[in-house]
Structure formats: C-alpha cells, structure tokens
C-alpha cells in the first residue's frame, strides 16, 4: 500500500454522509451552536431546512437539545469546534448517555488544526475528555473517504439500535480543519470498528489517527529510505482499539511501536492503545509523540505548531530508529 491517496484533496465530509442518510429516509436532525459554516453541517441544513435548529453560542444547551430530539425519535447531529464540544459539552454528553438519548457529534478544528485562533481554541484533551464516557465511541478519521463511510455507518447503527430496542451509543467524530486526502489507499473500504494497514513492514509499527496519520505515512517512507521496514496503521476508533488488526503487526515488529497524535500525551490515543495491548498481555515498547503537557500557541498554520512540538514525520522516524538502536 502507498500513502498519499492520490488526487484532489477536500475536507472530511461527515455532513455529506448526513445528507445521504437523510435522503435514504433516516430521521437525521441537526442542532448547531453558531459555527455550522465552519464545521460543514451548513450543507445539510441548506438541503433540509426543516431539519435543523440553531441554539446560538450555547454548546452545552446544544447537546442537551440534541438529546431531547433523540427522545422524540430523531437521530441528532450536534456540531461545534472541538474545544467547546469537549468542555461545555462534556456533562450533557454524559447525561445523554445516562438517559439513553445518544447523539452524534461533529467536533472540528481539533488540536493544532485551529492554529490561528490560539491556545484558547485549541482542543488538546479531547480524547481524554470523551473516551471514558460510557456508551460513547470516539472516532478520529484520517481521510475524507473514511469520514464519510464511518459517519454514514454511525447513523445506520443508531437507527438499527433504536429499532431493536437497544439503548445505543453516542458517536463523537473529531475532525481537523485543513484538507485531508480522499483516501490513503485507492479503493479502500472502512469496516466499522477496524483499523487500516496503510503500509506493511516488519521492524516497527507506526500508528496515527486524524490529521497526523499523514506524519506516520511520511515517517514510513523516510524509514524505508534507510532500510527500515515500518508498518503504518490508521487507528480511528480511539477508545475501541482494534486489537485483532493491530496485535499481529506489533508482535511481528517484536513489540516496537511509535504513535503520533495532535493531543496531549496523557490519556491520548497512544496511551489507550498501549493500555489495550498490555491488558491482553501483548509485550511492547511504545514511544508516544504528542503534546507534552503545555498549551499551544497562535500560528499561521498547524504545520508550524507540529514542528514546534516535535510532531513531524522526521520526529516520528527518529523515534522509531531509537527503538531499533
């Protein structure tokens, strides 16, 4: 497999999947808090003007209203920037799960993807904040095809749970701001709950998710130039680790793993992956690249902050090389 995906780039399209699902008859309903143009859900609202409500700059109320729509038979989709979704929305998300009123969330501009707005707007604890809420699935897609497929699958699963009389789960999608490739592998499919092997190797496993999967792909290419064979894995289901896919590659690499994420190292994707591997008894040594306990800064582009915080492809390749030395 090759990284890069080829072709024109476009933003990840969960809203396009919502439009598709509504056209197919699913009772999707949008609840927004002022930034629907930035999150992309405005396209759904334009297509279905009788299927949305705008609550203003009131993210906590947005999630609570969404839970209310769940109780009367809709499939609610709430949207805002990641920072406000995981802070102001945390208690309502917990109450929605407790009340058997799950919601689907699109929380965008995560991590350093919101470079220009500075530290106050940069969500760096989003995995940690949401992953431990019961009955809540955290998803960090890394390409447009994956985002579309998994959002459509989430809506379908929501409807199936309701029809079967099950309580169901909330699905929280964390997406970036800057462009994603359409696919990392041409013709790829995205089965629910599964990771995707982007590149196969034997010496070390590189795991990424969301916007920083690109760094893992590039790191794999840098290592190949040095004769190091790296497996690159996309891990979108952050708190539902796909051990069936990941474990054999970790064992093949004699336990050498490097993870990268646009998130604090503490309680992030890498920490949850390592915990899951340890819990099943898989011996491994992991180096986690992430934000080291500080806040972000204002910058023109996310790339400037990735360089400042050691989250580049070269940083990941160097970390992998250290595990091999």
Where are these regions (language model features)?
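Thiamine diphosphate
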Residues: 1-174, 179, 189, 313, ...
């Amino acid at each position: 497999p090759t990284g890069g995906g080829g072709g024109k780039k476009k933003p990840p399209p969960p809203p396009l999947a919502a439009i598709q699902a509504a056209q197919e008859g699913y009772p999707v309903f949008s609840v927004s808090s002022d930034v629907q143009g930035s999150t992309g859900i405005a396209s759904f609202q334009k297509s279905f003007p009788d299927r949305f409500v705008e609550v203003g700059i009131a993210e906590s109320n947005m999630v609570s209203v969404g839970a209310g729509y769940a109780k009367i038979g809709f499939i609610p989709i709430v949207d805002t920037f990641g920072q406000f979704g995981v802070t102001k929305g945390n208690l309502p998300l917990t109450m929605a799960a407790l009340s058997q009123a799950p919601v689907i969330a699109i929380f965008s501009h995560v991590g350093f993807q919101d470079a220009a707005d500075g530290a106050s707007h940069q969500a760096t604890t989003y995995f940690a904040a949401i992953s431990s809420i019961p009955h809540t699935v955290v998803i960090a897609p890394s390409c447009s095809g994956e985002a579309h497929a998994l959002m459509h699958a989430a809506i379908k699963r929501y409807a199936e749970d309701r029809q079967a009389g099950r309580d169901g789960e909330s699905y929280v999608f964390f997406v970036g701001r800057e462009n994603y490739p359409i696919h990392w592998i041409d013709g790829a499919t995205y089965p629910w709950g599964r990771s995707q092997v982007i590149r196969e190797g034997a010496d070390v496993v590189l795991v990424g998710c969301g916007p920083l999967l690109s760094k893992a792909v590039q790191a794999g290419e840098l290592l190949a130039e040095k004769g190091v064979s790296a497996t690159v894995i996309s891990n979108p289901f952050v708190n539902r680790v796909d051990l069936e896919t990941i474990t054999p590659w970790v064992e093949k690499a004699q336990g050498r793993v490097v993870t990268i994420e646009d998130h604090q190292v503490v309680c992030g994707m890498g920490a949850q992956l390592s915990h899951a591997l340890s819990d099943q008894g898989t011996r491994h040594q992991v180096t986690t690249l992430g934000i080291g306990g500080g806040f972000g800064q204002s910058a023109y582009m996310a790339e400037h902050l990735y360089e400042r915080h050691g989250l580049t492809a070269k940083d990941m390749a160097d970390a992998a090389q250290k595990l091999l030395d």
